[in-house]
């Protein structure tokens, strides 16, 4: 099958080459690359044309990454579709091959796996993220690694586009729709994608948490007090983590992260 990989770009000249290179070196070659560019003013377009001359490229004004992704999904001709952000990259050359081989069973609706966060400034890897899909776990906190989700195009069409009224958490909303359905999946154990930590500021975290709370209440209004407990607990924990980092007590954060998830949240739900 053909696999469509959608990348939204905006002044991504510093990072897009590594993203494209990671696609070009994939062992599986039946790939459709789609770039949706928000009228970049740097060399982003030039790099895309040089490194991915056969790619589908659209450069026009949009209102954010999720509107761009929706445009890409509409254009996609592949039977399987997914995204690769402009500052992220595939971790090895067999990622797409592993994705496609997972769909050899016609009953499979989507594939997902793990990501590895990295710091662009240092190049150092930070930590893994992503676990087997679970609606219950995702209602506590985002647990499915959205960048790794590659889905049958017909399933995406059934679920509908990203709700781009959410600035940051539209992927959370879309993943909840996916998990609320009875869809069959394959979870890939080996980390698939390196994801940049850039831009994950405390301010963005707060907005993301607020949007996630609103999304949860949209689907489960009867659980309002439970979700509010989770929201305030996680927000205070994030503030404490940021303070520890500012005080250069990063080792404490690393120890806490090691034990993250050991205490069950299921009693709250």
Describe each model-derived feature in a short phrase.
Residues 187-188, 205-210, 245-250:
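Short, structured secondary-structure boundary patches
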Residues 191, 195, 202-227:
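Catalytic core of nucleotide-sugar-dependent glycosyltransferases
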Residues 1-204:
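Nucleotide-sugar donor-binding/catalytic module of glycosyltransferases
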Residues 220-269:
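Membrane-proximal basic amphipathic "stem/tether" segments
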């Amino acid at each position: 099958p053909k696999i469509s990989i959608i990348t939204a770009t905006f002044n991504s000249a510093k990072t897009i080459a590594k993203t494209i290179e990671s696609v070009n070196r994939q062992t599986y070659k039946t790939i459709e690359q789609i770039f949706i560019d928000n009228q970049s003013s740097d060399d982003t377009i030039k790099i895309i044309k040089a490194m991915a001359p056969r790619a589908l490229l659209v450069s026009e004004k949009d209102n954010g990454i999720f509107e761009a992704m929706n445009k890409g999904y509409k254009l996609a001709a592949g039977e399987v579709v997914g995204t690769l952000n402009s500052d992220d990259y595939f971790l090895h050359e067999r990622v797409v091959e592993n994705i496609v081989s997972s769909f050899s069973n016609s009953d499979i609706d989507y594939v997902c796996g793990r990501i590895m966060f990295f710091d662009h400034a240092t190049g150092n890897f930070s930590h893994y993220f992503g676990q087997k899909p679970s609606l219950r776990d995702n209602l506590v906190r985002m647990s499915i690694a959205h960048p790794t989700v590659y889905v049958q195009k017909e399933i995406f069409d059934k679920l509908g586009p990203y709700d781009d009224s959410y600035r940051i958490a539209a992927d959370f909303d879309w993943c909840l729709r996916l998990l609320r359905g009875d869809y069959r999946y394959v979870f890939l154990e080996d980390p698939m994608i390196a994801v940049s930590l850039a831009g994950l500021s405390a301010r963005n975290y707060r907005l993301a948490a607020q949007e996630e709370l609103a999304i949860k209440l949209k689907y489960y209004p009867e659980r309002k007090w439970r979700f509010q407990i989770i929201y305030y607990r996680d927000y205070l924990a994030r503030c404490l983590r940021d303070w520890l980092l500012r005080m250069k007590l990063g080792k404490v954060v690393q120890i806490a992260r090691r034990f993250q998830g050991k205490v069950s949240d299921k009693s709250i739900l």
